[in-house]
A protein has these predicted regions:
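A generic structural signal for short, solvent-exposed coil/turn residues
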Residues: 61, 75-77, 86-88, 143
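Short, solvent-exposed polar/charged micro-motifs at secondary-structure junctions
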Residues: 79-84, 159-162
Length: 180
């Protein structure tokens, strides 16, 4: 199999079942090894990257929600997802966005366009529900290839599929799910 960076770059050329099979092949590569401290988190290195601690915090939260996590390397020459999350036979790629303060999540989401079609938002602070819902809806409107945003907020896991975000009742649904 080609080198890891080439395999990650190939994700941009694939879609549908072919994309899913390729993600699974990447996750099953022998280069992955479990962390000494977390047997459900696999890595191929990258412990020295600037964002490693944020990735690790989100990965541990994903494990709490029943996922096996594959932390992907961050090559400089191509934009790649941060994680492969595995649960119930399904492998999915996610780009991580960690929300710390009151700054606009909208810009951060739009920055992911072209990187990955699914985003994991790890909420570490309170954020205006309506602003977040608007940013999510806008992200799906701008990125026609996007299909899911997964939000971790405390002990809540809130999945938002494209079809839901583009419905008129999305704001009411989101408020109920996010604020409960």
């Amino acid at each position: 199999m080609r080198n890891f960076t080439d395999e990650l770059a190939k994700l941009h050329q694939l879609s549908g079942a072919e994309y899913s099979r390729h993600v699974e092949r990447i996750a099953l590569r022998k280069e992955f090894h479990p962390l000494d401290t977390d047997s459900e988190i696999y890595t191929v290195g990258g412990e020295n990257s600037d964002d490693y601690q944020n990735l690790l915090i989100a990965a541990r939260k994903a494990v709490e929600f029943g996922y096996r996590v594959y932390m992907l390397p961050n090559p400089t020459e191509t934009r790649t997802p941060d994680f492969i999350l595995y649960k119930k036979g399904v492998y999915r790629t996610y780009d991580l966005k960690t929300v710390y303060g009151k700054a606009s999540i909208g810009d951060s989401l739009l920055d992911s366009v072209g990187q990955c079609n699914s985003i994991l938002i790890n909420m570490t602070t309170e954020y205006n529900t309506r602003r977040l819902a608007y940013a999510i809806k806008r992200y799906f409107e701008v990125n026609e290839k996007a299909w899911e945003i997964l939000i971790f907020k405390g002990r809540k896991r809130i999945p938002i599929k494209r079809t839901l975000a583009l419905k008129p009742e999305f704001f009411a649904f989101f408020k109920k799910a996010y604020e409960r």
